[in-house]
Structures are given as structure tokens and as C-alpha cells.
Amino acid sequence: MGPTTATDAGARMKPTTVASAVHRVQMALYDGAAASREPLLRAAASLLSGPDYADVVTERSIADACGYPACPNPLPSEDARGKAAPRFRISLREHRVYDLEEARKFCSERCLVASAAFGASLPPDRPFGVSPDRLDALVALFEGGGGGGGDGGLALGFGASGDGKEVEEGRKVEIMEKEAAGTGEVTLQEWIGPSDAIEGYVPRRDRVVGGPKKEAKQNDACSAEQSSNINVDSRNASSGESGMVLTENTKAKKKEATKTPLKMFKQDEDNDMLSSCISDSIVKQLEDVVLEEKKDKKKNKAAKGTSRVGKSKPAKRPVGRDGHEVDFTSTIIMGDHGSEMMDHGALGQYNFSSSILANEQPSSSQYAAIDSVQAYTEELDELFSNAVNIAKDETSDDSGRCTLRSSLKAVGSKNAGRSVKWADENGSVLETSRAFVSHSSKSQESMDSSVRRESAEACAAALIEAAEAISSGTSEVEDAVSKAGIIILPDMVNQQQYNNDYDNDKDAGENEIFEIDRGVVKWPKKTVLLDTDMFDVDDSWHDTPPEGFSLTLSSFATMWAALFGWVSRSSLAYVYGLDESSMEDLLIAGGRECPQKRVLNDGHSSEIRRALDTCVCNALPVLVSNLRMQIPVSKLEITLGYLLDTMSFVDALPSLRSRQWQLMVLVLLDALSLHRLPALAPIMSDSKLLQKLLNSAQVSREEYDSMIDLLLPFGRSTQSQASLPS
């Protein structure tokens, strides 16, 4: 007793391994430790694998105990189960087959389901790297009931209540999300992607909090250097008698010629106010210019036809409020036919667009910016008035040129062209539009002439090709003309004249000569399938299809065409039992020429043959069962394989149904019953069974006989077989 106790104590002092712990847990489950305490079975799930649990179920069933460790009931006796109990059970409702051998390891269906669910939840392999303390606690829980291992039961999540009953105590687990990623790691946000990865979606937190902060940072970074671009487009500002288009580009630069990033104003209110300030002031000045020019035009009628385009002269460079210099360029174009065609109405309208690029610091408030723009606009008005006065003085020189000088053009700045063109210089708007239309018509005529030239060259090349083919004698006239792509059209004008002459009963000899002459290329007199009306004549080579006509083949036609392409001389020789020496005598069979076997070099024939073998093997067992054949299926397959070896497979297999494939195999077997499989002759002569198969395949007896004639062109009687050429 003493040595045994010492040995057990020594075994417990040794470090516990995973294998030894699994074995001791299996033994505890085998002895029924989990029968009285079901939570122990869930504790064993942390150590056992699927195969380990299956071993426990098998050992318990051998010991006539229920295979489910949590069940204390024994297995039913053999007398209760029956000695001749079946092994499998077929469920017609679920269309499944159940193995009852596994069910015999359990006392009831409930234990079978519970055991299968528990076994499916176990991992396929044992856990790796379990600490020895946890192994000792788990083993002590099974062997000592949770008390021998100290707090081993509590460490596993099981404790004992005051009344001795074990209660399950779940361990508190707290999940912490790592905020900062270590080296070589990525955060969850980087791995999944930003929240705005979906196009058009902006999270609410980014819309409220993130947006203004980011914009503020960008404004601080670009506060030193920034620019603005304001595009003002004011159309239909005022009405006038002559069309007029004004385009003004105002640019503001710093003294240093350095590249600075452009900063767009995003305030819509500022844009509207700036647009109104600039457009109202300049359009007002522009109206005064137009009125004064009209007065001068009446006084100086001789200067109407002179050119009013001149080069610009340098003027003073305006200085803004912040000291930056501004380049201003204006262009006035009057009477442009393009703008007249675009505008609606009899009178032209002003199309005004202005662009200001200013390199200045954004003011602290919108009102300060508006004040600076108003002051800047007043300076523009004064300079523009000076430029108009200079232009008036230049209209009276001898050269007759009217030049509108730039009001803000500086020396050394980028040159820009300015021109003033009156609408009546080229006549009225209607005359200008007519000139534009005539120019477009001329370009269209030139394009048509080039197309006609290319067509003539193509026709000449086709005629030369046809003439060479006819002169060489390689082809006839009609073939050469069709190959060259030439279509000879009838003379519709002379055709009507010839018909009238024929109706007036002219000389018969002349009519005969006329018929002979024009009979060389006789145009058909039936409607043709072409889209143009030019070919809508009688007697065509292409007749219109009748009503209800369809190119889709029936199932019988599809099967007949497939057999017609498969059969070769070798097939007929094999069916009639002839040797290879007599195959030449089968050149003409049933009034048609029987070809030799053909095999494609690219391997498609073998692929088609393998697919056909699959279809035949699927249809043959059903056919044997329906016809109650006594011949083994293997022999039928071998004989059919020899027959298929003699056939030609060039085209793809037709898409047939299973009933139709069975009929195809039946045709082959019927042909083989003549010489190769004579035992099938009585079955093939049974009209009732045969008619039943024909009805299922939707084929009549006459159609079936026509398919048999492809394989038996000389008939199936012995006399016709003996009369074959040998």
C-alpha cells in the first residue's frame, strides 16, 4: 500500500504533458465522470480533439454504455434491438440514407444528436502550448472532483456552492483595442480603409468636426502666398442695335516674378458682389462708347469702310490699394457673325465676361474685401475713360484706322491683341450668315468630290481584277464579277423605254435581237432581300421566304443529320460483316456516295468521340432496362465502341435530350442486330416496345426507318446481305 501511494505521488509530481492529460481525461469520461456533472464535458472541450472524443465514444459503446459521456444510461440489449436489425435506413422524405451502425452506439436519438454536435465543435488537433498549471488543474478537476487541485476548478471556471453543488462561473474577459500600431503592424483603419472609401459618403463626424479644422490648417499654411480667380459672366447686360462682344482679362501680380499657388475664393456671396460691381461699371462705360461712336459714324460717313483694327500702345500701370501692379487687357469685337448666329433675337446682345487674378492677402472680413474692390473699380473706370478719349482722337487721322488703346497695358508685360470690328463692315448679319453657309457648302462639295473619286478608283480596280480573271481563263464571267464585288444594276430609264417599244408591237426581228443582246446579263424579276429600293425588281436569285418559314431544325432532322455525317464506308462494312477488301464496292450505297472515314488533325475528332462515349454510356443502361435485354451491358458497350471507331466525327455533337440519345443508341443497336448482335433481333421486332420508345422521343415510325436506312442501305434481309458486292 505504501509503495503504491509513493508511486502515485511521484507520478503526480512529474510535469504533466498534453498527451498524458488527454489520456487521464479520456479515462475519466470513460468511467462516467461527466454523467453526474455535465459541465465537465464542456471543460474537456478545451483539451480534447475530435479523434480523442471519438475514441471515448467507441470505448463506452464497447462497454455497453451510451457513447455520450454525459448520459448514464446503458445501451439497449440485443434482444430489444433485434438480431437482424438493418444497417442502413432510407428516408424517403429527406431523400437521404442514414448509417445505423453509428446510431447503435447511443441509447437514444437525443444522445446521438448531442454527441454529434459536441464532436463537431471540437478542433481536429490537440491544443499546443497549454501551461502545465492549467493541465494539472484540469486533470484534478476530473479526478478529484474539483477539490484535489486546490483552486483548479475555480481556475477553469467551475466552482462549488455552499451546498456542494457545482455552479458554472464564467470568466470575465475584457477586450482592448490597440490604438497605436507597432513596427510592422497596421491599424484597423488602415487595413479596412478610410470611412470615405465609398464614393459620395462622408461620415457625420468628418462633416461637423474634421472639415473646418482641415480647412483652417490649409488657410494658415497658405496665408503668406495666395491668389484668387474670379470669373464673372454677365450676359444680356444691355440691348443695342449692333452685336457686340466684350472680353476683359484683369490680372494682378506681385513685383517678384515667382510662381505662387492660386487660391480660389470659395464664398459665393463675395463672387456675386464682385461680379455686380465690375460688370455694372464697365458696361455703363461701354454703353457711352457705343453711343458716341454712333454719333461719330453719322458725321464721318467716309470712314465706314476703313479698317478699325490697330495695335495697342502702352499706358500707365494702375496700382492697387495694396501696392501691387495690375495688368488689364480689353478686347472689343463688334458684328461678329458667330455671336450673331448664337444669340437669339433680331438685335445683338452684349456678352460680357471678366476675369480678375489678384495676388493679395485675404481681408479679415467680407466687407473690407468689398470696399477694396469698389475702390479698385473706380480706378478702372477712370483709366477706361482715358482710353476711350485716346481712341476718339485717333479716329480722325489720315490712315483711317480706329485703335482702342489698352487702358492698363504696361511696358514689358505680355502682349495681347485688341480689335474693334463693326457689324456693318461686312454687310448685314444675313449676308454674313449666307457667306458662312456658302463656305460650308463648298467644303461639303469638295468632300463629296473626294468620296466620288475614291469610289471611282475602287470600281476601276474591281473591273481590272475581273478582266484579268476572265482573260486568264481561270473563271467565268459571272464568277469573276461576283468575286470582284461588282453588282451590275439594270438601266431603269431605258428599261421603261424598251417596255414601251415592246408594247407598241415593233418589228419582231428587232425584238428578238434586243432580247438576245440584253440576255447576256439578264436581271432577275423577283423581289430581293435588300434594303434599297433599287433592287426591288422581279425575278431575283434570292426569293423571299414564305410565311411561317424557320431555319430551326426539328429533333428528327437534327438526329438524321448527325447520323448522316457519322456514317462512313467502314461503318457499313462493319454492320454487314464485310472485310476491308470489299469496302471499295460500298462507294455507292442506297443511291448516294458513301465517303471514307475522316479524322481531324487538330484532335477535335477524338474530343467529339469521348463526348459521344459519355452520352452512349448514359443512355445504354436505361435502354437495356426498358427493352428487357438479356445481353450484358459490357458487351453492348464494346460492340458499340467498335462501331463508333469506324465513324467520322467532324462537326460538334447536337444538343439532344436524354430520350433522343436513347433513340440514337437504339438505331445503332438495331443496325448491329443484323450481324454483330443477332440476339437483339427478336427485341427489335417487338413493335409495342419500339413504338413506346419512339413516342417518348417524339419520332414516327417512318422517320425511324429513314434513320435505319442510313446504316442499312442494302436492307436487313439475308438475301440482300448475300447480294452485296464482294
Curated annotation (Swiss-Prot):
The keyword Lipid metabolism does not apply. Gene3D superfamilies: 1.25.40.820. Residues 209-242, 294-323 are annotated as: Disordered. It comes from the Eukaryota. GO terms for cellular component: cytosol; nucleus. Pfam families: RPAP2_Rtr1. It catalyses: O-phospho-L-seryl-[protein] + H2O = L-seryl-[protein] + phosphate; O-phospho-L-threonyl-[protein] + H2O = L-threonyl-[protein] + phosphate. Residues 220-241 have a biased composition (Polar residues). Keywords: Hydrolase, Metal-binding, Nucleus, Protein phosphatase, Zinc, Zinc-finger. A zinc finger (RTR1-type) spans 43-131. Signal peptide: none annotated. GO terms for molecular function: RNA polymerase core enzyme binding; RNA polymerase II CTD heptapeptide repeat phosphatase activity; zinc ion binding. It is found in: Nucleus. Disulfide bonds: none annotated. GO terms for biological process: cell differentiation. Zn(2+) binds at C66, C71, C107, C111. Residues 209-218 have a biased composition (Basic and acidic residues). Its EC number is 3.1.3.16. Putative RNA polymerase II subunit B1 C-terminal domain (CTD) phosphatase involved in RNA polymerase II transcription regulation. Belongs to the RPAP2 family. This is Putative RNA polymerase II subunit B1 CTD phosphatase RPAP2 homolog. It comes from Oryza sativa subsp. indica.
